[in-house]
Amino acid sequence: MFDMSSSSSGWVAEIYLRYQLKRGITRLIERKQVGPLMVQRPFYPEHGSSHTYLLHPPGGVVAGDLLSINVVVEEGAHSLITTPGATKFYRSIGEVARQAQNLRVEEDAFLEWLPLENIFFPSAAAILETNISLKVSSRFIGWDMLCFGRPMLNETFESGNVIGQTKIFVDDKLILADSLCVDSTKFKAAGMREFPMLGAMYIYPASEALKELVHRSIQDYLMQTKESLEIGLTDVDGLLTVRALGHQTEEIMGCLVLIWKTCRKLWLGYVPDIPRIWAT
């Protein structure tokens, strides 16, 4: 979390959400918020799991904003959290926008962290930090989609800087530290290879059966859609990471959604409907 007393010229916003299983239904039992970060009332479209829409500051994120998002899913609970739209990071004239996400998933709990994309406008300056704490018996599916510039408008990320770090722990042991530093002048050095879109998906636990199904799903998606995605898979201590480079949000999200459905069917025995907000 950020020091909420620290000086900032922008929004200082923090939210804390705690989910608990009660009589077979996951409930949002605790919510604390400061500033414009908020959630809509959870709803239950499937089998007792809780779906929550996280609302970011109106109008997007600007230089000097400090955002802190904290989620705890207690033992046996199952929560899906998404956003109703892309989060936009606007240009900076000096200050940096910062966003910290701290996600904790307890024994036998399941968190699906599925926000829509972050869009970084030219001259944006941002630091993104994500810490995910799991137990051996937890389940987790989460993704980040980052768009640099606005490719649909032929607007490139010709200036700006974005630094990101994701750390994932299992039983307090660090098993993944993913870092990203995108400078407008060094796209290739950042691993972007001049693609404007980057997607990363994290799946735990990844059995051999799950990895085979995910690999097959990706192959089928690429053959059917003819999308020009670059996709790689890595497995570290049972954590499967999917990384994708592309030109548009739709092509990357289409692939990640298919992987999500594949994992859900293996774990829970059915294919979920996508959150309705994604279709609006």
Curated annotation (Swiss-Prot):
Q: Does the keyword Phosphoprotein apply?
A: no
Residue ranges of the TM segments: none
Any GO molecular function: nickel cation binding
Q: Name any GO cellular component annotation.
A: cytoplasm
Which Pfam families does this chain map to? UreD
The UniProt keyword set, sorted, is: Chaperone, Cytoplasm, Nickel insertion
Q: What is its main location?
A: cytoplasm
Tell me the InterPro entries matching this sequence: UreD
Q: Where in the cell is it found?
A: Cytoplasm
Protein's job: Required for maturation of urease via the functional incorporation of the urease nickel metallocenter.
User: What is the annotated quaternary arrangement, including any partners?
Assistant: UreD, UreF and UreG form a complex that acts as a GTP-hydrolysis-dependent molecular chaperone, activating the urease apoprotein by helping to assemble the nickel containing metallocenter of UreC. The UreE protein probably delivers the nickel.
Q: Which family does it belong to?
A: Belongs to the UreD family.
HAMAP family the UniProt entry points to: UreD
| Stated name of the protein | Urease accessory protein UreD
Q: What lineage is this protein's organism placed in? A: Bacteria, Pseudomonadati, Pseudomonadota, Gammaproteobacteria, Vibrionales
What is the gene called?
ureD
